[in-house]
Amino acid sequence: GFKQFVHSMGKFGKAFVGEIINPK
C-alpha cells in the first residue's frame, strides 16, 4: 500500500543521495 510506496521511495532516495555524495 501507501506505506510500502513511501518505504521504497525512501530507499531509492537514500541510494540516489548516496550516489551523489559517494559516487562509484
Curated annotation (Swiss-Prot):
Expressed by the skin glands. The keyword Magnesium does not apply. It is found in: Secreted. One of its GO terms (biological process) is defense response to bacterium. The keyword Secreted applies. It comes from the Eukaryota. Keywords: Antibiotic, Antimicrobial, Secreted. GO terms for cellular component: extracellular region. Has antibacterial activity. Belongs to the gastrin/cholecystokinin family. Magainin subfamily. This is Xenoposin-precursor fragment B1. It comes from Xenopus borealis (Kenyan clawed frog).
